[in-house]
């Protein structure tokens, strides 16, 4: 796996953040790691990005390229090297040998313990910086305006990246038109989304689900 110095993980964060002291509501097993493990975070983010990569690029091999199947010239007595098909990669217009295919797998293996260490490190950083708000942001109906009003109550509507861990469908539909709000189910939280977040909003029930995930 690459060293952490070989890549920079850029994220624009908001200055002068509103602080929330939620340490009393946070379990120590998830949010009280004293020293963040940056190499584990780096490796996990690389793996998360690689797993999203799709092998959509492709070229035609000799079986797929158009052309005759006739033997170009007879086997012997021409002085030329023997050839069996014009679609061979050695001819102009022939198929590509060893080209990119849609079957390529870009996934990078990261050990489970390293993933867990990275996830807890990211959560602990948010807790230490007082960037976690324990609150049930459930919505009775789909309304972006009501959600914005709720964010204004906590004076967090101007933050660049608000991460909400919730499974509420009304909340998801209300937040999808807000560029600075990202709503993710607890079992889909990634290390990269936690690192980029200015604020994590999570309910006590979702914290329990988070403990089960770890």
UniProtKB/Swiss-Prot annotation:
Task: Indicate the transmembrane segments per the record.
Answer: none
Sequence ranges of Basic residues compositional bias:
71-85
Q: Which UniProt keywords apply?
A: Ribonucleoprotein, Ribosomal protein, RNA-binding, rRNA-binding
Q: Does the keyword rRNA-binding apply?
A: yes
Q: Which intervals of the chain are annotated as region Disordered?
A: 56-86
Question: What are the BP-aspect GO terms?
Answer: translation
Could you tell me which InterPro entries the record lists for this protein? Ribosomal_uL4 (IPR002136), Ribosomal_uL4-like (IPR013005), Ribosomal_uL4_dom_sf (IPR023574)
The cellular component terms of Gene Ontology attached to this UniProt record, alphabetical and capped at eight, are: ribonucleoprotein complex; ribosome
What does the record give under GO molecular function? rRNA binding; structural constituent of ribosome
Membership in a protein family = Belongs to the universal ribosomal protein uL4 family.
Q: What does this protein do?
A: One of the primary rRNA binding proteins, this protein initially binds near the 5'-end of the 23S rRNA. It is important during the early stages of 50S assembly. It makes multiple contacts with different domains of the 23S rRNA in the assembled 50S subunit and ribosome. Forms part of the polypeptide exit tunnel.
User: Do you know which PANTHER family this protein is assigned to?
Assistant: 50S RIBOSOMAL PROTEIN L4, LARGE RIBOSOMAL SUBUNIT PROTEIN UL4M
* Record note on quaternary structure: Part of the 50S ribosomal subunit.
Q: Return the protein name.
A: Large ribosomal subunit protein uL4
Q: Please give the organism.
A: Mesomycoplasma hyopneumoniae (strain 7448)
């Amino acid at each position: 796996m690459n060293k952490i110095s070989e890549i920079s993980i850029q994220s624009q964060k908001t200055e002068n953040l509103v602080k929330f002291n939620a340490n009393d509501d946070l379990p120590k097993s998830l949010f009280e790691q004293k020293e963040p493990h940056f190499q584990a975070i780096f490796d996990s983010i690389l793996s998360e990005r690689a797993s999203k990569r799709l092998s959509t690029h492709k070229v035609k091999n000799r079986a797929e390229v158009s052309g005759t199947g006739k033997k170009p010239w007879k086997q012997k007595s021409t002085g030329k090297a023997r050839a069996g098909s014009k679609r061979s990669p050695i001819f102009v217009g022939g198929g590509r040998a060893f080209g990119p295919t849609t079957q390529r797998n870009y996934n990078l293996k990261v050990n489970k313990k390293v993933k867990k260490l990275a996830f807890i490190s990211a959560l602990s950083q948010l807790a230490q910086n007082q960037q976690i708000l324990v609150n049930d942001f459930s919505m009775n109906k789909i309304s972006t305006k009501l959600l914005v009003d709720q964010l204004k109550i906590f004076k967090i509507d101007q933050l660049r990246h608000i991460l909400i861990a919730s499974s509420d469908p009304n909340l998801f539909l209300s937040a999808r038109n807000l560029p600075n709000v990202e709503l993710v189910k607890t079992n889909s939280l990634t290390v990269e989304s936690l690192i980029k977040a200015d604020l994590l909003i999570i309910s006590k029930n979702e914290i329990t689900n988070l403990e089960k995930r770890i």
